[in-house]
């Protein structure tokens, strides 16, 4: 599927700056101005300016958006770079990695900036910067940094992008300030687009809706699959909410703030879904990024609502059995009309299986 790269980058740039702009500026500012040598050279601790920036980073660390080594004041610091900014998608952490796993070599203070999952579709679009191949995703990072007046490279820090693709020989890719020409058009795989959409709804379920914090009674990760249906428009969500709550009182609850239909009754692996979520990524990016023909393809039988629209991902749980296995599936109004996704639960009320 051919897309306009400028539109793709602009949409994700607007999303990132609108929701995270002040936070991004604050992270760059703290990494740039905090002086590690001050800690090592002053027995009484850092000066007030350095301590203020460390406080900023500690606040980000408490939100799992930064990493600070525990023994900074005792370390023997050289003139090498010890600080970094790393851009990464949330799904990398949901996949089992910790922030420490994402640190560039030698870095002991790092701030992390999370980009939308769908932006990583550009990982497989390669551009040449100097004599090196880089993912087009770095164009988004460079565009964002320029618009927010953030320096990607400083005297004592560098900026990196953690890339999931193996096409570049390593995951951590340095983001330099060198200019390069973006291709006007890029070919994207429909399968890649659908997979990133599934990762996007998985991150939303885990981090923002926090649906895995409250599992249905009787749910066992070793036996059961947690099924999430992602809907692309509010009308479809309303239809599913009305149909299920009316037919099976007490089995579901609806959160109209987070736009999610929860399964709260007795759990059975035979049930077709555990939760229904409105996926906002469709309206905020895809609907603007593609023409009508491309949107029809994605919402048809070969796209999100068809062959490519079902993915199994995992989420680390507090259960003794280990991870929760999650199946994400998208439906469109057309898919709802063509098949029954509202199973009769009357036979399941006697107990869990």
Swiss-Prot record:
InterPro entries: Phytoreo_Pns
Function of the molecule: Suppressor of RNA-mediated gene silencing, also known as post-transcriptional gene silencing (PTGS), a mechanism of plant viral defense that limits the accumulation of viral RNAs.
Record-stated family: Belongs to the phytoreovirus non-structural protein 10 family.
Protein name per the record: Suppressor of RNA-mediated gene silencing
